[in-house]
Amino acid sequence: MRRAALWLWLCALALRLQPALPQIVTANVPPEDQDGSGDDSDNFSGSGTGALPDMTLSRQTPSTWKDVWLLTATPTAPEPTSRDTEATLTSILPAGEKPEEGEPVAHVEAEPDFTARDKEKEATTRPRETTQLPVTQQASTAARATTAQASVTSHPHGDVQPGLHETLAPTAPGQPDHQPPSVEDGGTSVIKEVVEDETTNQLPAGEGSGEQDFTFETSGENTAVAGVEPDLRNQSPVDEGATGASQGLLDRKEVLGGVIAGGLVGLIFAVCLVAFMLYRMKKKDEGSYSLEEPKQANGGAYQKPTKQEEFYA
């Protein structure tokens, strides 16, 4: 509770601070991350008009603390023993621009030469290690500076040093809890941001207003599939003509009906032949054991019986 109350008090104090000396920073932020992505801005046409020239934006110390980028880097390296190495510097848009709701804020590491160092010590629970690198900012047009993407851009694909975690905290005018503590800059200072030099898995910066759409990584499975496909093409071709002709004949109803009818007729003929052979064999066996009188050779003509002589004793 005490920590939350302290944060609220610091945020309220930050809202009452007045801007100090303006600072000029040359903007060199990749244009693909400056796309509105759904933000309807009258000053932004959205058409691809080619590479846009670099613009120079004047940055002033915060007056409202609503249009800020907050990038918090948490290193995995051993934490330093001194807490004086951390201070917070927030960069905002020019005072004449109005913030938009839901805009993310970036928290960058800066030199510990500000008037709110003591307050930051109280609000910070653990020290952080800062790497001093000059911040480069780039805005395609002056209209883009009025949108939510005009400040420091952090790449969503992991453009942070290894071991550092990136946290984005959206802020709104009605949500002061997520706003950073107030820091009053006494003069021109160089912003220090933890940035990673490597830009792997990023599409090249496109011309116009297009934002980087997607980043695809080629996996081993896709490569394996691509290697298998040529093997399938190198196989010997099948005679599609003969196969298609045979399948076409079988698919025709009249041909299929003729084949079935011929098979049935052949089966009936074979059964009749076997039955006839069995019948002949049976009749032959019956004739060999017959007791009937043999037929006469003359065709059945009448013959006078022979007279038998009797002998008496």
Swiss-Prot record:
Which Pfam family, any one of them, does this sequence belong to?
Syndecan
Q: Basic and acidic residues composition bias: which ranges?
A: 97-129, 286-295
Q: In terms of one coarse class, where is the protein primarily found?
A: membrane
Record's keyword annotation contains Metal-binding: no
Q: Which positions does the site annotation Cleavage of ectodomain cover?
A: 253-254
Provide the transmembrane region boundaries: 258-278
Share the record's PTM remark. Answer: Shedding is enhanced by a number of factors such as heparanase, thrombin or EGF. Also by stress and wound healing. PMA-mediated shedding is inhibited by TIMP3.
Q: Which residues lie on this side of the membrane: Extracellular?
A: 23-257
Q: Cite the PROSITE patterns for this sequence.
A: SYNDECAN
One cellular-component annotation, GO: extracellular region
Q: Which GO terms describe its molecular function?
A: cargo receptor activity; extracellular matrix binding; identical protein binding
Q: Which residues form the signal peptide?
A: 1-22
Low complexity: bias regions = 135-154
How it assembles, according to the record, is:
Interacts with CDCP1. Interacts (via C-terminus) with TIAM1 (via PDZ domain). Interacts with MDK.
Which family would the database say this protein is a member of?
A: Belongs to the syndecan proteoglycan family.
Q: Which PANTHER family match?
A: SYNDECAN, SYNDECAN-1
What is the protein name given in its UniProt record? Syndecan-1
